[in-house]
Amino acid sequence: MRALSDWFIVDFDDKRIQIRIVEPGTPSKTEILWKDIIRVCYKTGSFLESDEIFIFVKQRPESYLIPTEASGTTDLWGEIIERNLFDAKEALNAVLAEDHTVTCWPPPK
């Protein structure tokens, strides 16, 4: 079985995030513009589960899900924090939270 990082790939530049699925039979590519992001959530997994990043944009009610085991996700998480789309202190708390804890930025009103 191939590792998730072999077929789920995340790249970004100054304008967009690109999510590519290169699994045979189900290739796809999605782009998310930085300027369209309205909320980011981080969900901790358990010992055998990947943590997950959820990105919400203006144009759709559902989020984009990016498992932290995907290739490029560590750099993406750093860029999300650098762009102030997630508070740095809260990001540390989110990553260290108990299993299955969801932390969002900005926090719910």
Question: What are these regions, as identified by a protein language model?
Answer:
Residues 2, 13-44:
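Phosphoinositide-binding peripheral membrane targeting modules
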Residues 28, 38-109:
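Acidic, Ser/Thr- and proline-rich intrinsically disordered linker/docking segments
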